[in-house]
Every structure is written in structure tokens, then in C-alpha cells.
Amino acid sequence: MQRRRCRYAIGIDEAGRGPVIGPMVVVGVAVCSNDIDKLVALGVRDSKQLTPVVRAKLYGEILRVALHSVIVKLPPALLDAVNLNQLEVETFEYIASRIAGVHDSPEAVYVDAVGSPEKLAARLSGRLGVRVIAEPGADKTYPIVSAASIVAKVVRDAEIRMLRRLYGVRGSGYPTDPETIAWLAEEYRRNPANPPWFVRRTWSTLKRIAPGWYVEKQATTQPPRGQRSLLDYLLGEKQS
């Protein structure tokens, strides 16, 4: 199949940064510049403003419009082992680099920023060599980031449904959800010595309801020698 060529931008967002259960999902969506209006016409906007049914419908439409997409699922063990802000930046870079490795460089990369937007934009721009727009709430402002947000949310929701089906998990996985907290407390009483693999053990929520599962975070912040990045190391991709 012939590779499609166009001027394009990348939108990147995540779902599941804060939950105590399940992965964090980070998604990059590349869209040709002349197709951005198609996202608007579809009704793409901040995923939190949409129902699960609407998000699921838009998921397929977004992937059909997209030039390219990359989905990264960061499991709880990885989130427990690595500085979260560092990992998120490395994942943004990884996604943009993957897309640019298949297509020409993008016109711009738009990301929903956590922390300092200026520092994030400068770091990513320096590493990627392209214009980076990093803003808090970018998923509310830029349709291309909204698209990434929707895809990430749909994938994250599917992961939680799988955990419900296989392990009986209840609730959304967020520490503010009473059903999630009740389920964790029940599981801890049943099996205090063996925390489920899908629980984030460094989350402070566990100190109160499952102290035997809780571990202090000793976060890795730098890649070992000979690795391109922390994420490359964690994904087992050695520098060539």
C-alpha cells in the first residue's frame, strides 16, 4: 500500500493518569491539516463531555480520518517504578518520533500539558526539532488533541471492562470512586499478601485501605547508559 503524504499535525493526550487501578493510556493521533475540519464535523471535542456510547462511535471515525495513530499502554508496575512526569514526557516523545519515522516531520505537535507547559514545550521541541504547543486543557481547545483524548479514553475504558470481567473489579479505578475503594478494601481483607498486578502500589490511597500492598516509590528518572530514553529502556529497545 502506498504511503499517504500530506502536511500534518500530531495531537497527544492520555487517559488514566490518576487511577489506582489499571494502565495509563497515552495516544498520539496524526491528521492531515486539510482533514482537521472533518474532526470538527464529526463532533470531536473533550472526551469528558461525551458519553461512553458517543466516544465509542467517534473512536472508529477518528481512526478512519487519521493519517497515523500510536497507542501506548503503561502498566501499573511501570507507573510505580518511574517518575510519572518524566515517563509522560518520554512517552510523548516516543509517540511523536514513531509517527515522524513513518511520515515526514509534522508541522506541529499539540499536547495536553501537565505541570509547566513552557518547559514541556521547550523540551519536546528541542528533542523532536518541530514546533510544540503544550497547554493545560488542550483537549478542550484543539480538535486533534480531543481526538487523541477520545481514543485514549475508549482504550482505557476497555481495559477496565476486561479487569471487571476477569477479576471482578468494581468501579472506575479512580481513588475518588467509593465503589473502587470498597472493592480494594474487600480484596485486601481476602488476600493481604498478594496485591493484584493491576493495582498501582505506590498510590497513597493504599496506605489507608491496603497498607500491606503499599510500597514507597523509588522512581527511576534517568535511562541507563547506551539507551536513547527512559521509555526505550523500559520497552527493551536498545540504541542501534
From Swiss-Prot:
Family recorded in the similarity comment: Belongs to the RNase HII family.
Cofactor(s) needed by this chain: Mn(2+); Mg(2+)
Gene Ontology CC, one term: cytoplasm
UniProt-listed NCBIfam families: ribonuclease HII
GO process annotations (BP): DNA replication, removal of RNA primer; mismatch repair
Protein name (Swiss-Prot/TrEMBL): Ribonuclease HII
EC number in record: 3.1.26.4
InterPro entries for this protein: RNase_H2_suA, RNase_HII/HIII, RNase_HII/HIII_dom, RNase_HII_arc, RNase_HII_hlx-loop-hlx_cap_dom, RNaseH-like_sf, RNaseH_sf
Any one GO molecular-function label of the UniProt entry: RNA-DNA hybrid ribonuclease activity
TM spans (from-to): none
Entry keywords, A to Z: Cytoplasm, Endonuclease, Hydrolase, Manganese, Metal-binding, Nuclease
Record localization: Cytoplasm
Gene field: rnhB
Main localization, broad class: cytoplasm
Annotated binding of a divalent metal cation, by residue: D13, E14, D112
Catalytic activity field: Endonucleolytic cleavage to 5'-phosphomonoester
UniProt cofactor note: Manganese or magnesium. Binds 1 divalent metal ion per monomer in the absence of substrate. May bind a second metal ion after substrate binding.
Role this protein plays: Endonuclease that specifically degrades the RNA of RNA-DNA hybrids.
Organism listed in the record: Hyperthermus butylicus (strain DSM 5456 / JCM 9403 / PLM1-5)
Keyword Manganese: yes
CDD domains noted in UniProt: RNase_HII_archaea_like
A Pfam family it matches: RNase_HII
Domain RNase H type-2 per the UniProt entry, residue ranges: 7-215
Native organism taxonomy: Archaea, Thermoproteota, Thermoprotei, Desulfurococcales, Pyrodictiaceae
